[in-house]
Every structure is written in C-alpha cells, then in structure tokens.
Amino acid sequence: MQENPTFNHQADLVNSAIRFINSWFRQSKTITAELSNFFILPGNKVIGAEVIVARLKGIFGQSDEYVGGRYDIIDVNFELMGEEKGMGFVEGVAGFRAVLKDQSKIISGPFKLYFALQNGSWKIVNIEFPGFAY
C-alpha cells in the first residue's frame, strides 16, 4: 500500500485543530502544545508564544467555565515548501457558552487557525477564534 503524504498532512492539521479547540473549551493548559514558538500577525509582525499564552490565560480567567462547546470544520488547506516546511490553515465555525457565576454569554462565530510546518510538525502561528483577540 502506497503512503499518501497529502492525507497525512491534512489529518495532522485537522487533529491539531481539534486538540486546540477541545483544549479551548476546557480552558486547559494543554492548549499550549499546539502553539508554535512564534506567531505571525498581520503586517508580518512576529511575537513570541509567551505573549499568546498570557493572552489565553487572561481570556480564560474571565469565565468560570465554558459549556456546550461545538464546532464544525469547513475547510482545510496547506502548501508544502520543500519536505520540512509548509503553511496551512483549518477553518470553520465554533460556539460555546461562557459562564461566570450566575450569568452566561453565548460566544460564537467563524474561526481560522493558521499553521506552519516545522521539523515535521504542524504548529499554530495565528489564531482567529470566537472570544480571542490580540
């Protein structure tokens, strides 16, 4: 049986996105495992992952918990630039209810997670996700 590298890269991207989204819904520290060491923002601004991790902690600290998390992945795409480098994205829609004491708020919308292939592993280099802002 012949190996299909396209399928493997697509599956890796989807699996990484699912781990990120599920970690988001649980407000889990494991979310950092999917992040690159650097992030590329619009205007080619580059920031370290520690800035993103601090931002995620701040966002997660605004709610006691997230409940009812749901998502649909609509598109996955990537482009390889040699054997060890590439860029890709996973996009779709996501929603959840942010609960704080006796109040709750529904947060939903489109998402797009941007990835870079580094050392054989896809890592997130930019986040567009409901409830997240830089």
List where the protein language model places each region.
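Short, solvent-exposed loop/turn segments at secondary-structure boundaries
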Residues: 44, 102-104
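Short beta-strand edge/turn micro-motifs at domain boundaries
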Residues: 1-2, 105-134
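Surface-exposed, charged secondary-structure patches
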Residues: 54-102
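A short gly/proline-enriched turn/hairpin at secondary-structure junctions
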Residues: 34-51, 65
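A broad structural signal for short, well-ordered beta-strand segments within beta-sheet-rich domains
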Residues: 9-13, 66-70, 124
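Short, low-complexity N-terminal intrinsically disordered segments enriched in polar/charged residues
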Residues: 1-30, 38
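Short, hydrophobic secondary-structure boundary micro-motifs
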Residues: 32-34, 125-126
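Extracytoplasmic/secreted envelope proteins and their assembly/folding machinery
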Residues: 17-18, 32, 53, 57
